[in-house]
Every structure is written in structure tokens, then in C-alpha cells.
Amino acid sequence: MAKFMTPVIQDNPSGWGPCAVPEQFRDMPYQPFSKGDRLGKVADWTGATYQDKRYTNKYSSQFGGGSQYAYFHEEDETSFQLVDTARTQKTAYQRNRMRFAQRNLRRDKDRRNMLQFNLQTLPKSAKQKERERIRLQKKFQKQFGVRQKWDQKSQKPRDSSVEVRSDWEVKEEMDFPQLMKMRYLEVSEPQDIECCGALEYYDKAFDRITTRSEKPLRSIKRIFHTVTTTDDPVIRKLAKTQGNVFATDAILATLMSCTRSVYSWDIVVQRVGSKLFFDKRDNSDFDLLTVSETANEPPQDEGNSFNSPRNLAMEATYINHNFSQQCLRMGKERYNFPNPNPFVEDDMDKNEIASVAYRYRRWKLGDDIDLIVRCEHDGVMTGANGEVSFINIKTLNEWDSRHCNGVDWRQKLDSQRGAVIATELKNNSYKLARWTCCALLAGSEYLKLGYVSRYHVKDSSRHVILGTQQFKPNEFASQINLSVENAWGILRCVIDICMKLEEGKYLILKDPNKQVIRVYSLPDGTFSSDEDDEEEEEEEEEEEEEEA
């Protein structure tokens, strides 16, 4: 049977603790220590926790306070050296650095405490919303907070107007900041060589249209000829006897105002002997009018969306063609130039041809450049005294006022037309500059702008005319900050670069994502009709093989 063994109890009547010390521990020196203490520490920093002398050594740790385990090196007089202990003068920043750091730490701590307090007092659903808001705020700051330039928005890469092939060689590169510094003043007065076509008179009833008396835009089926330079029979005839640089007003306006462009575009240059021909590619988008190209956030819809950049450009071109004919007195008296329209055949109905006149003009740029340009007028207008004024008719269209920092035309066009034109200048600076250059080259007395909006925001097929406005090209150029000297300087620079090239075909291409234009040399046969036929035959053969 188990029994209880009473232990030996030591009674110390004069104190506390054991009465006797075992023999093996008698007379042994002891110093409190910790396993975390380093042996032979250079200095003991653990004892300086409290700076107030009233609490010195009261709560300090005594571990490692002795010198039993310290390592002492023998004195070596050779290593003795004097040290300069004089205090250096601190700068104002160094003196206040700790003060600012402590202030920032206190501020951050207060914010964290306040945030924690707010989270504690919110209900559960509100807590989740607050945490989600803080998470999104941190994400936004991480993405955009470190940017130095707030105007650099994240834009997806744009496509080039033409695919650059591997066998194309870069001959020259010009950046926009360099082109913006160009100036050229030695431009002679233009000389009219030949005038062709017939113009209809402008209907002044369109000047009285307001937002309250809007007029539907009609679809007018007329033929518009957009013939390139080398296909123009008049230019071919003139090139035999005079001139060494040939182009159309649309091509030159693209070059003269290129520093405002954002989207990619291209122009074909042919060097034949000592002559230069500026052309556009067949079946290209060169004649399409861009929409909100220079806006801070241009349209970026993709696919078949009616607000995609290409569909908006086709809509704007459709509106411009119809308005330029609807605002004329169609079917009535015409103003005829001495020569007929060179692109109209004899068996064609004259009423099916759009009202347009061609003025072939000549400029002398110095002693070596003889420039011949085909310019266009869209209509003619009679003044109060019966004088005749030639006009260019263009159209600005509203597609959705909620985008691109737009202004609602139906509310602002009559009362604040200046705000509307200022917004359009910001969003369509390049397009307005091109139109102004074309009017200046043609010598038009006025530039007519029509304001056309969608009948409904979601319907891109029906439109209404909300008003018109008239400008003198020179005055409008000053309003939109278009320097005519800079425009001629850019053109002269491009011509000089192309004149230095060898005979052949070249391409001037605006980079789709950079402010730079490049000149590429093209192999023989590029962009020719024979090459297009071969590509079509290859595509047909591939389709037949797939079907087989």
C-alpha cells in the first residue's frame, strides 16, 4: 500500500530562502546575465532606457552589467591617436530635421488612430465600403500619384495609316518641336494659271438658322471628285512646261499644319528628274475628316461602334459633303469659270456633280522652287453691292457632348458661341488648321462653318443643322494661333529634304504614337496598281485553296 513520505522542510527563522548552501555552490561569484547578452560588449546601451535621473537604475536591466565575461585587450600605444571632438555647426535643415520627422510621425499616427476610430464606429457594411474606398484610393495614388505631368493620360497605341515593311529605309526624320521653329517669308504673291468648274450660290437663309429653328440635314447624292496630283490632267499638262513641285491644297495643308496632328497619315512623294509630285495613296483614309483628334481623351471605341474613330470620321465626311451642297441654291444659276470641270465627262448630268471650282495657282519659293497647286472653292456668295466672293464651306459636327469635355450645342450655340468654337478648337485643332490653310491657298474670301448635330445621341444616321458662322481666313488663322510663316517654313523644309533625294518613290509617314514624321524610300512598284492586282490575285488564290 502506498504511503505518504513527508519531505524535509528547512525553516529559516531569521530570514527567507534556504538555510544552507550546497557545498558545490558555496563561495561561487555570481552576476545576473542573459543568454542574449554578447560576450565582451564594447558598450552597454541597455542601461540608458530612461533619461530622467530620478528613474536611473530603477527599472534598468542588470543583465550584462558586470565585467566577468568582458574581453579586455592589452594596451597598444601604437594604435593611440587623437580624435577631434569639437562640435560642428549644423545647418538649419539638420537642426530642424528631427523636429519635422517627429511632427510627421505624430501626424501619421493621428491619422491612423482617427481612421481606426472611424472604422470602429461604423456598422459592418459601412466598414467594408470604407475599406474598399481606401483600397481604391491607394490603387489610384499608386498609378497616378507619382506622375510629374498630369496631362499625359494613358492611351492605347494607335495604328499606323499604312504598314511599314521591312524593306523600307528611313531617309529622314523630323520631330514636331523642330518643325514648329521653322519660318519662311520669301513667298511670292500667287499667280492664277487656270480656273475650271462651276459654282452654285450660297443660300443666305441658312445664316438665320438657330437652335430653335433647326433644319434637318438632307442626304444629297452628288459626285465628289478627290483626284490625286498625278492623275490630274491639268497638272500633267502644266508639268511639261512649268513648275517643279506639284500638289493639291489638301496635301499641302496636311503638311503645313502637321504639327497639330495626332493620328497617323501618309503622303507619297515621287521624284521624277528635277520635279516633285506629292500624292495620296489610292483607297486610303486621307480624305476622311477626323473627329475629336486633338482632345485630351479622344474617342477610343473599337469595332462596329458608331463612336469608333473610323466610323466618326466617315460620319463627319458624310455630313460635310451633304451640308456643303444643301446650303447652296441647287439647280439654279451657277457661276461658271472659263474652263469646264476637268474630271467631268460630256455624257454626265451636270446636276449630279458637286458644286466645286478648281483654281490652279503658282507660287515662287525663292529662286529654285516653282510650286503649282490645285486649290478648290465650294461656293460663291454675292455681297451687298453685288460683288462676288468665293467661299469654302466646312462642317463641325456634334456627336456626344458628354465626351471630350464637350459643350451642349442646343443650349450654348446661340448664347455662348465663343465657348463652342473654343471647345472645337481644342478638340479639332488639326482639322480646323487644315481647313484654314486650304482657304488661304485658294484665296477664298470667307470660310463658312456649319454646326450640325445628331438628331439623337444614339443615332448616327440622322442629323440637324443648328447654325452657321462665317470667318475671314486670315483673321481666323490668328484666332486659332496658326502662323502662316511657320506653315510655309514647314513646307519649304519638307520640299528641300525631298529635293535632296535621288529619283524614285518615297513615303512621308506621321508616326501614330510620336510627334515625328519620317521619310521612307519605297521599292519599285510599291502602291502601284500592278502591285494591288497581284495582291488581289494572291488573295483569290488563297481563298480558292482554302475552299478546296
Curated annotation (Swiss-Prot):
The modification N6-acetyllysine is found at residue 53. Residues 285-299 are annotated as: RNA gate. One of its GO terms (cellular component) is eukaryotic translation initiation factor 3 complex. It is found in: Cytoplasm. InterPro entries: eIF3d. Transmembrane segments: none annotated. Residues 529-548 have a biased composition (Acidic residues). The modification Phosphoserine is found at residues 161, 528-529. Its main location: cytoplasm. Keywords: Acetylation, Cytoplasm, Initiation factor, Phosphoprotein, Protein biosynthesis, RNA-binding. mRNA cap-binding component of the eukaryotic translation initiation factor 3 (eIF-3) complex, a complex required for several steps in the initiation of protein synthesis of a specialized repertoire of mRNAs. The eIF-3 complex associates with the 40S ribosome and facilitates the recruitment of eIF-1, eIF-1A, eIF-2:GTP:methionyl-tRNAi and eIF-5 to form the 43S pre-initiation complex (43S PIC). The eIF-3 complex stimulates mRNA recruitment to the 43S PIC and scanning of the mRNA for AUG recognition. The RNA gate region regulates mRNA cap recognition to prevent promiscuous mRNA-binding before assembly of eif3d into the full eukaryotic translation initiation factor 3 (eIF-3) complex. Component of the eukaryotic translation initiation factor 3 (eIF-3) complex, which is composed of 13 subunits: EIF3A, EIF3B, EIF3C, EIF3D, EIF3E, EIF3F, EIF3G, EIF3H, EIF3I, EIF3J, EIF3K, EIF3L and EIF3M. The eIF-3 complex appears to include 3 stable modules: module A is composed of EIF3A, EIF3B, EIF3G and EIF3I; module B is composed of EIF3F, EIF3H, and EIF3M; and module C is composed of EIF3C, EIF3D, EIF3E, EIF3K and EIF3L. EIF3C of module C binds EIF3B of module A and EIF3H of module B, thereby linking the three modules. EIF3J is a labile subunit that binds to the eIF-3 complex via EIF3B. This is Eukaryotic translation initiation factor 3 subunit D. The lineage of its organism: Eukaryota, Metazoa, Chordata, Craniata, Vertebrata.
